[in-house]
Amino acid sequence: MKLFELQPAPGSKKLPKRKGRGHGTGNGKTAGRGHKGQNARSGGGVRPGFEGGQMPLYRRVPKRGFTNIFSKVYTEVNVSALNAFDDGTVVTQELLKEKGIIKKINDGVVILGNGELKKKLTVKAARFSKTAAEKIEAAGGKVEVI
């Protein structure tokens, strides 16, 4: 077999429908748009959420709640993810980002207790859950709130 002999599997390449190219195609004249009306025109159609003049759902449903501008968003990391580090490592928020465990630090990192920790680490983070702190200390590590 040579490179120039390669071809796609039969039936894997389908030609697009050529609309408005004669009635023999089954898609001639109106090109599948029907006769006249808003949807037959170029740029025709209604905006998303428009219900034909009836009061739309997004306006019938009441507004609720607000976004608290003072809320803190923490990036969550489980203790099982900390096994990626070597024994005796000082794990910081920046190191977690560098290693690719988290994408963004946000307002800080919170360590949660899901999974098992098999390494002895010193972990520095904004917050720790009770179980996470217990598991880190049980593995012989240290917990430091920053």
Curated annotation (Swiss-Prot):
Residues 42-52 have a biased composition (Gly residues). Keywords: Ribonucleoprotein, Ribosomal protein, RNA-binding, rRNA-binding. One of its GO terms (molecular function) is structural constituent of ribosome. Binds to the 23S rRNA. Belongs to the universal ribosomal protein uL15 family. Part of the 50S ribosomal subunit. GO terms for cellular component: cytosolic large ribosomal subunit. SUPFAM superfamilies: Ribosomal proteins L15p and L18e. Transmembrane segments: none annotated. GO terms for biological process: translation. HAMAP family: Ribosomal_uL15. This is Large ribosomal subunit protein uL15. Residues 1-57 are annotated as: Disordered. It comes from Acetivibrio thermocellus (strain ATCC 27405 / DSM 1237 / JCM 9322 / NBRC 103400 / NCIMB 10682 / NRRL B-4536 / VPI 7372). The keyword Membrane does not apply.
